[in-house]
Design a protein with these regions (language model features):
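Alpha-helix N-cap/start motif
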Residues: 1, 39, 61, 78-79
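Helix-loop-helix junctions within the multi-pass membrane cores of secondary transporters/permeases
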Residues: 1-53, 121-128
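Re-entrant/interfacial helical elements at transmembrane boundaries that shape
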Residues: 4-9, 21-31, 44-46, 61-73, ...
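Hydrophobic transmembrane alpha-helical segments of multi-pass transport and channel proteins
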Residues: 12-20, 50-62, 78, 90-106
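Short, conserved aromatic-histidine micro-motifs
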Residues: 79-95, 124-128
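Cytosolic juxtamembrane C-terminal amphipathic helix followed by a basic/polar low-complexity tail immediately after
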Residues: 101-129
Length: 129
């Protein structure tokens, strides 16, 4: 069924909660360091983060660890700033996880509707009628 395909795929590559959190957290850390992030600096970071997040979900909290290399190379984050990013990420990770799971469910419903398949099996429908 559609759900059997979409939900595991979404758990692997759909990490909207982590991505949003990491972008906003990196902007906050940059501003605390006295640097104002611009659209020209953030757009390449967001694109690279999107690619990185596909490979990140192998371990819990893996997104922030995969992002540290980008932050160091693109924004010259120091080890203190990287530690702050890890702390911020772990403090709010449950909210990002809730966003990811809700998004996966919504995408599964949309794909199910797109292919005009019911999420209720025929056997269950017969038992209801």
């Amino acid at each position: 069924e559609v759900v059997d395909f979409v939900v595991p795929l979404g758990a692997t590559i759909h990490l909207a909660g982590d991505t949003i959190t990491l972008v906003l957290s990196s902007m906050a850390v940059l501003m605390m360091a006295g640097t104002t992030p611009t659209l020209a600096t953030m757009v390449p970071f967001i694109f690279m983060l999107g690619v990185t997040m596909v490979a990140a979900p192998g371990i819990p909290g893996g997104g922030v660890y995969a992002t540290l290399g980008l932050l160091e190379k693109m924004f010259m984050f120091t080890s203190g700033q990287q530690g702050l990013m890890i702390a911020i990420h772990f403090a709010q990770d449950s909210f990002g996880t809730a966003t990811n799971v809700s998004g996966d469910g919504a995408i599964a419903i949309l794909v199910d509707k797109l292919f005009k398949k019911s999420s209720v099996s025929e056997e269950v429908k017969e038992n209801i009628v």
